[in-house]
């Protein structure tokens, strides 16, 4: 992570229809760059998920490292609705997103 005990990981897992996976992946690269420009974001790493996803979808996962809980709370309050709406405007119901927050054990 960052070595900072206050840092948190905001994990976003995306299940995307296989038919739009290439277009979604291209959009996701730009989206991650926009997220990293927001206050409190330190770094991000994107992954493809190895386990198969049911019903013709592929999965991606992004780990965003944020400075601390306050930065995450500010993002969720001030920026998340707009950032999430962009993906929905482009891809509609052709993807699903789930999110969780991870904290270091030590």
Task: Describe the function of each predicted region.
Residues 16-18, 68:
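Beta-strand elements of well-folded, non-transmembrane domains
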Residues 7-15:
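Active-site-flanking beta-strand signature of metal-NTP-handling nucleotidyl enzymes
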Residues 47-52:
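Short, solvent-exposed loop/turn elements at beta->coil junctions and helix N-caps
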Residues 20-46, 83-85:
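Short amphipathic alpha-helical segments
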Residues 36-42, 55-58, 65-101:
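An amphipathic, aromatic/His-enriched active-site/gating alpha helix that lines ligand/cofactor pockets
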Residues 102-106:
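Short, low-order "capping/linker" segments at domain edges
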Residues 2-8, 54-56:
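Short, flexible turn/loop "capping" segments at secondary-structure junctions
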């Amino acid at each position: 992570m960052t070595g900072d005990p206050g840092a948190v990981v905001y994990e976003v897992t995306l299940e995307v229809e296989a038919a739009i996976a290439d277009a979604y992946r291209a959009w996701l690269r730009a989206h991650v760059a926009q997220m990293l420009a927001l206050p409190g974001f330190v770094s991000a790493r994107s992954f493809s998920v190895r386990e198969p996803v049911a019903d013709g979808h592929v999965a991606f996962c992004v780990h965003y490292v944020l400075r601390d809980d306050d930065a995450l709370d500010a993002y969720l309050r001030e920026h998340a609705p707009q950032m999430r709406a962009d993906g929905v405007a482009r891809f509609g119901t052709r993807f699903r997103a789930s999110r969780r927050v991870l904290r270091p054990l030590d």
